[in-house]
């Protein structure tokens, strides 16, 4: 059995409890790692791998990082999905008997990191927990440790839908049970979410106040999340707020796939924010406001009174230009109050953080004054509700210097005059050299020795040096010999000894006292955290509403009107993002009118004509309106929409083994199963991923089902011109087309939506724009003429047909067996649109087994 040194035994004992984390083991000024941790960390962090003697026959692998720069290394590991356990020395090495006591003081995980570049200002950093409630429902909770925000909700769907929802919210780490981890594991990597297992739950006696507003079924996720936070952070976190319950009926629900298709927060192309609705709407000037805007985008409102309340504030801000500009000027001076409050509670706040808190709170009276003086009741109500936190400002103004350093260890954080003893120590430390110089001059005058000097070294401290030729001039009764040199003697006096102790200890004692005073101030601030958080919430909402007002003015947006019916009327509507991207080019506006008895629209027209843009435009106007923002239209009279479903331009989900057509069918199934008459449904070219007749049949049957069974406001684009005939059979269906024309043999897209069906597809013209070879285009024109002449078969090939590359699987002459015909009948009876993906797979498996058994 290998015998290690006591220190290494201590390391191994600690490591046993943190097997899934890198253990940063404090040794002096370094955090050291050993064994596998050292090997792996040296590769990931690109630091030198060395070794050390640990009492065994062979040296063990070791690497380390300086404690003062450890944050950067920790952040790198956490960003890559690893966990880091911080093991500190918990006693003074000078007082230790044997091995210095050490213990883990924090476990930093992907969801709990509290500082560094990972915490991007305008984005939340959420950690979540989920629990499977039944076969189709998951309860979940999430919180941002850096701000204290905490939310609980639920979602219907499978494990992939849950993870897509978590990914949409930006959740970095999801706490699950062992069984749920198995269910989610295959999708977690694609979603870039770390799954962490936690079996324990915080007891209700500790957590009751956190979950009062949460339904009992969802509380288990909250309790498990709190237990994990408590276990990893190992400190009181007074800034974590009570969980709010997001009851879905109060919000416009948009599934993660539709959010992606509409490019609300991330663009489909680059995955960044440019070209998204968030990019357009974000004129916020605070980090808090940026995060709040993103939250509102994720969950627009679905309660008319709440929407109209926001719109009323935006209207008043638009009418008060000078108030608006003064408010934004003041808000630009406000730092991230939510995260500053979080750092106070967490205990990692610095002097500069407290200065930022003080300077931010100093802006609140000016903000309040502007709101109260605006002459608008809505703005005055906001102003009255603001807490200026005067007592916090007074404490920080009295205690903290104007420009403190980043870390408390550098000193000069506490203001002079705040504490008498600290002032004395600082005076001694700052003026020690002056006192020494003055004493030296006094001793020269007393003794008459012109070359008498006072010096200092680390061994003997301060001393008075007199050359041997002048010793007879000194009053040796006042001097005590300290050191003898070849040509001089060194002495000390009682006064010098006392001053030496004061000078040498003053700086060290000053820093220690300053740190203790800083901790007292930090702890005193904890009782103000709820007030600062409430203020931050008000300021963040004001920032977003100011952003809505400035954007609405800049882009000539219009105030939407809401009613309790289902009709949707948008006059001269525009796609806000496309319009901005076009810069000075003219954007062609379009109407969209869906009446109560005519609320399905079938859109035809050539590729590149703007069908998809038109459909997205309608959805974005609904989203913006229900966020409480003005919209890009001359007029918008809208119903309250409960859900938006989109099937527009999905990319192949190859990683999940799903083709474009399969994704199309799954998303269509989800929409049809969950939509209500109050929903908005957008379908772009359904059925294009399969054969013409299959696709056309699916598209028609879906339109009929939505028309007859659901009744939702629906936009349905297609290349199947045959479907336009359905206008005669479906009373609520109207045909429209995106106009195009020919000029000099070239297609010109007018981007104008007009009533009626398109009379031409212009597919070959689009191919010409793409500069396909003329030989191909010419042949296509010939084939098109044949098809349009009514030929039912493919035009005769110009070359002799080659034998098929693949033999047919079936011969037409072979009759179908009765048992096979029975399987076909069963297949025909399956309601595909009313079947979940898992049920469909089971049915398919059963039918396949029946066919295979026939051949045995």
Swiss-Prot record:
Q: Does the keyword ATP-binding apply?
A: yes
Does Ribosomal protein show up as a keyword for this record? no
Single GO molecular-function term? Answer: mismatched DNA binding
Keywords of the record:
ATP-binding, DNA damage, DNA repair, DNA-binding, Nucleotide-binding
Any one GO biological process: mismatch repair
Question: What is one GO cellular-component annotation here?
Answer: cytosol
Q: Which Pfam families match?
A: MutS_I, MutS_II, MutS_III, MutS_IV, MutS_V
Which residues are recorded as binding ATP? 605-612
Q: What does this protein do?
A: This protein is involved in the repair of mismatches in DNA. It is possible that it carries out the mismatch recognition step. This protein has a weak ATPase activity.
> Which family does this protein fall into?
Belongs to the DNA mismatch repair MutS family.
Name the PANTHER family for this protein. Answer: DNA MISMATCH REPAIR PROTEIN MSH1, MITOCHONDRIAL, DNA MISMATCH REPAIR PROTEIN MUTS FAMILY MEMBER
Q: What is this protein called?
A: DNA mismatch repair protein MutS
- Provide the species name: Lysinibacillus sphaericus (strain C3-41)
């Amino acid at each position: 059995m290998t015998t290690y040194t006591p220190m290494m035994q201590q390391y191994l004992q600690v490591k046993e409890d943190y097997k899934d984390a890198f253990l940063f083991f404090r040794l002096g000024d370094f955090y050291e790692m050993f064994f596998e941790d050292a090997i792996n960390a040296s590769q990931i962090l690109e630091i030198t791998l060395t070794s050390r003697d640990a009492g065994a026959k062979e040296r063990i692998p070791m690497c380390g990082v300086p404690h003062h720069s450890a944050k950067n290394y920790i952040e790198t590991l956490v960003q890559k999905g690893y966990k880091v356990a911080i093991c500190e020395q918990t006693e003074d090495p000078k007082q230790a008997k044997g091995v210095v006591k050490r213990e883990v003081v924090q476990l930093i995980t992907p969801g709990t990191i509290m500082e560094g570049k990972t915490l991007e200002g305008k984005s939340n950093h959420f950690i979540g927990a989920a629990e499977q409630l039944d076969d189709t429902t998951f309860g979940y909770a999430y919180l941002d440790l850096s701000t204290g925000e905490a939310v609980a909700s639920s979602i219907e769907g499978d494990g992939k839908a849950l993870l897509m929802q978590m990914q949409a919210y930006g959740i970095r780490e999801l706490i699950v049970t062992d069984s749920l981890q198995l269910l989610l594991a295959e999708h977690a990597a694609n979603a870039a979410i770390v799954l962490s297992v936690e079996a324990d739950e915080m007891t209700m006696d500790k957590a009751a106040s956190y979950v009062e507003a949460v339904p009992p079924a969802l509380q288990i996720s909250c309790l498990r999340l709190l237990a994990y936070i408590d276990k990893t952070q190992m400190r009181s976190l007074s800034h974590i707020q009570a969980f709010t319950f997001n009851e879905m009926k109060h919000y416009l629900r948009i599934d993660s796939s539709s959010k992606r298709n509409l490019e609300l927060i991330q663009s489909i192309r680059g995955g960044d924010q440019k070209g998204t609705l968030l990019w357009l709407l974000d004129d916020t000037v605070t980090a808090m406001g940026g995060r709040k805007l993103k939250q509102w985008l994720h969950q627009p409102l679905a309660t008319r009174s709440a929407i109209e309340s926001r719109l009323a504030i935006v209207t008043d801000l638009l009418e008060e230009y000078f108030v608006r500009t003064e408010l934004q000027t003041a808000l630009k001076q406000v730092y991230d109050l939510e995260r500053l409050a979080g750092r106070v509670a967490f205990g990692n706040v610095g002097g500069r953080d407290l200065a930022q808190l003080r300077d931010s709170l100093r802006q609140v009276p000016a903000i309040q004054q502007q709101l109260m003086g605006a002459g608008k009741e809505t703005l005055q109500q906001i102003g009255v509700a603001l807490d200026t936190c005067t007592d916090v400002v007074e404490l920080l103004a009295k205690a903290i210097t104007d420009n403190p350093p980043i870390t408390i260890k550098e000193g000069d954080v506490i203001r002079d005059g705040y504490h008498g003893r600290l002032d004395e120590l600082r005076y001694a430390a700052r003026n020690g050299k002056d006192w020494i110089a003055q004493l030296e001059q006094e001793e020269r005058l007393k003794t008459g020795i012109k070359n008498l000097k006072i010096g200092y070294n680390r061994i003997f401290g301060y001393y008075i040096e007199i050359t041997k030729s002048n010793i007879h001039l000194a009053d040796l009764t006042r001097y005590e010999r300290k050191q003898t040199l070849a040509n001089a003697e060194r002495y000390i006096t009682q006064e010098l000894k006392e001053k030496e102790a004061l000078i040498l200890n003053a700086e060290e004692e000053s820093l220690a006292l300053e740190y203790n005073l800083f901790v007292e101030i930090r702890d005193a601030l904890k009782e103000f955290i709820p007030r600062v958080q409430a203020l931050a919430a008000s300021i963040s909402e004001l920032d977003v509403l100011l952003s809505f007002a400035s954007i609405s003015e800049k882009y000539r947006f219009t105030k939407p009107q809401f009613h309790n019916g289902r009709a949707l009327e948008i006059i001269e509507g525009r796609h806000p993002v496309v319009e901005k991207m076009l810069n000075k080019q003219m954007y062609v506006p379009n109407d969209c009118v869906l009446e109560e008895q005519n609320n399905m629209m079938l859109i035809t027209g050539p590729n590149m004509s703007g069908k998809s843009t038109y459909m997205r435009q309608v959805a974005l106007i609904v989203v913006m309106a229900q966020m409480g923002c003005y919209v890009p239209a001359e007029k918008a009279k809208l119903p309250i929409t409960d859900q938006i479903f989109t099937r527009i331009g999905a990319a192949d989900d190859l990683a999940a083994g799903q083709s474009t057509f399969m994704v199309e069918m799954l998303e269509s199934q989800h929409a049809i199963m969950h939509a209500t008459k109050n929903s908005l449904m957008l379908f772009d070219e359904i059925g294009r991923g399969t054969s013409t007749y299959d696709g056309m049949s699916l598209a028609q049957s879906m339109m009929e089902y939505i028309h007859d069974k659901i009744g939702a406001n629906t936009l349905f684009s297609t290349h199947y011109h045959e479907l336009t005939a359905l206008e005669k059979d479906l009373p609520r269906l109207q045909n429209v087309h995106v106009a195009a024309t020919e000029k000099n043999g070239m297609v010109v897209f007018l981007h104008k939506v007009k009533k009626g069906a398109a009379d031409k597809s212009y597919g070959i013209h689009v191919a010409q724009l793409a500069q396909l070879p003329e030989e191909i285009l010419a042949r296509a024109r010939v084939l098109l003429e044949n098809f349009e002449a009514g030929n039912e078969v493919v035009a005769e090939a110009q070359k002799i047909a080659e034998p098929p590359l693949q033999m047919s699987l079936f011969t037409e002459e072979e009759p179908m067996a009765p048992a096979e015909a029975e399987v076909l009948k069963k297949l025909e009876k399956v309601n595909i649109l009313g079947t979940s993906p898992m049920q469909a797979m089971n049915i398919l498996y059963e039918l396949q087994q029946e066919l295979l058994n026939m051949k045995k």
